[in-house]
Amino acid sequence: MTPSYFTRYENLAMERTDSGILTVRFHTDGGPIVFTGQAHHDLPRALAEIGDDRDNKVVILTGTGDLFMDEIDGDSLGEIFKPGEWDKAYWEGRRVLQRLLEIEAPLIAAVNGPATVHSEYVLLADITVASEDAVFADKPHIGFGIVPGDGIHVIYEELLGINRARYFALTQQRIEAREAETLGLVNEVVPKDAVYDRARAIAEQLAEKPQLFLRYTTLALRQRLLRRLNEGTQLGMALEGLTAADLAYQAQSAA
């Protein structure tokens, strides 16, 4: 029987093989996802259900078409300059990354194209396979004028090192696939039409291993990231909320 959560979330298409490989594909109406307030609301809840399902031995995250995630509908996030609304965003934002890491199964990212919105989702994976045309960036935060404090700052600092991460955040640097591989952001770069197949092949190899080994190994390897995210997102998202409120104040003052 197909679990009910497979079809519960409008921006997530899910399917699972008999060997326990769950593929989670981001989309909007069957095309590349446009990240919205609804997606922000749904993700922590979907990830909790995925993590609770012990039939998921390996999880693959991927996008649709030529993009992983490259567009965001800022207006759909609501009036996040209001404390009550930001509290909701704060709760959801912190738990997305926590719950990704709390899935007790190997997480493989198949980055099928540019990841300039929430690229931290794929960089949190245990194994990241990228298309040769993939690009990693943080388009929304600096573009909107708000602090990148939702955890993306932690992930890039862990993977790039402190100085490179600060440069990345402040300059809106775009890191192309081959450079990302050299810097250690991704594990493999493959032709575009081979991304999912390569991720699936790795997943099939892992799915043959004992499930307790898979669960407990991923648990052991993620402890540092969990600690860093817990520390970094508390202050980071508070500062992000302050800058969101300031943007609204500046707009009101200029009106």
Question: Locations of the language-model features?
Answer:
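Catalytic-core regions built around general acid/base machinery
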Residues: 46, 92-104
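A short, well-ordered alpha-helical element
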Residues: 35-57
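Ligand-binding pocket scaffold of soluble enzyme catalytic domains
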Residues: 5-15, 21, 30-31, 39-44, ...
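Crotonase-fold acyl-CoA enzyme core
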Residues: 99-211
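Terminal peptide-recognition signature
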Residues: 24, 43, 61, 106, ...
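Glycine- (often His-adjacent) and acidic-residue-rich active-site loop
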Residues: 55, 62-95
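Structural motif
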Residues: 21-25, 60-62, 108-110, 129
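C-terminal alpha-helix plus adjacent terminal tail
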Residues: 1-22, 28, 65-69, 75-76, ...
